[in-house]
Regions:
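Short, aliphatic-rich beta-strand segments
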Residues: 22-28
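Amphipathic alpha-helical interaction surfaces in cytosolic regulatory modules
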Residues: 37, 42, 59-116
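Poly-acidic low-complexity segments
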Residues: 16-18, 34, 106
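Short, intrinsically disordered, charge-balanced linker/junction segments flanking boundaries
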Residues: 118-122
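Structural motif
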Residues: 28-30, 103-104
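A short, well-ordered alpha-helical element
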Residues: 31-59
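Short beta-strand/loop segment at the start of cytosolic alpha/beta domains
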Residues: 1-18
Length: 122
C-alpha cells in the first residue's frame, strides 16, 4: 500500500497520508467548490487503509494533524464524516491522535477546531 499525497491549490489543502509513519496531515486552506468530490479519494484511501493495515493489526497508532489556515462549512461537514471514520478505527484497537494547529492570532480557527473535535466525541 502506497501513501496518498494530494497537492494543494489556492482553494484546496495539501493532504499527505504517510503510510510508513502512520500520519495524516492537512495543510492550509480548504474551500473546494465541491468538498465531497474533493475529499472522495481520501475517503476511499481510508477505507483501504482500514482493510489493509487496521484489520491486519499492522497499525497501532495513527496521528492526524490539522494545520488549516481556513476551512469552509462544506469542509467542516466532510471533516465530521472523516472523524466518524477514525472513531470506527479506534474501536478496532488503533490509538488515533488528533492534533489541531492554528495561527496564534486566530481565535476563530481555534474555536472551530474545538467544536469539531468536541462534536466527534459525542
Amino acid at each position: 500500500m502506497n501513501s496518498l499525497k494530494i497537492e494543494g491549490t489556492t482553494f484546496t489543502p495539501e493532504i499527505n497520508f504517510d503510510i510508513e509513519n502512520n500520519t495524516l496531515t492537512f495543510l492550509k486552506v480548504s474551500k473546494p467548490a465541491n468538498a465531497i468530490e474533493f475529499y472522495k479519494p481520501l475517503f476511499d484511501f481510508i477505507d483501504n487503509f482500514e482493510k489493509v493495515k487496521v484489520k491486519s493489526k499492522i497499525t497501532k497508532e495513527l496521528v492526524i494533524d490539522f494545520k488549516f489556515t481556513y476551512f469552509n462549512t462544506a469542509t467542516a461537514k466532510v471533516l465530521y464524516e472523516l472523524l466518524g471514520k477514525f472513531k470506527k478505527i479506534t474501536e478496532q484497537g488503533v490509538d488515533v491522535v488528533v492534533n489541531w494547529y492554528y495561527p496564534s492570532d486566530d481565535d476563530d480557527l481555534l474555536e472551530e477546531g474545538a467544536e469539531l473535535l468536541e462534536e466527534d466525541k459525542a
